[in-house]
Amino acid sequence: MFKYFFTILLTIPTAHLFANNHKSDTADLDDIKLYDIVKVEHCLDQAYDTIPGHARKLEFKIEGDDPIYEFDIESINDGFTYNVECNAEEGFIIEVEKEVSADNKIFNSGAKISIEKAKSNAIAIHPGKVVSQEREIGMDGSLTYEFDIQTDVGYEIKVDVDAVTGKIEEANIELYEIGMEKE
């Protein structure tokens, strides 16, 4: 009995060293409750009114000083997946982009730089590992490469690169993501 008690007594003080031995990009989640934002259901309803379909993923990110819900919605009309962004303070849709494949003729005819060049531009500014990449066509006809980068300093950032100029259009810190990309 004493032997077991002695082993437990020695183990308890060192257990915390192993329990928190990982990087987390969710450290800022407690800050979200300080935002004055609409319910996610309100923005989801707005997104469904814009693109009828099925939500596959939800991301919460900060664009400038605005909190944004971004939904990936698989359209019941054409089967494409759309990224629908909703301003979480105001509750209205601010952007819609259609995800397209690598062989999309419209995207390929308009894009002037390769996805590899766009990726190197993004990583040069935000060093880390690209964990996902997409080709998107905006409702205004704009062509964008989108990269999710797990940065070397521990947070995830979403970087949009203009497929015509190669310039970074925006880079936004992603606070959380629920769901998965369609395979």
What do the predicted segments below correspond to?
Residues 2-8, 16-183:
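Long, terminal "pre-/pro-" and other extracytoplasmic accessory regions
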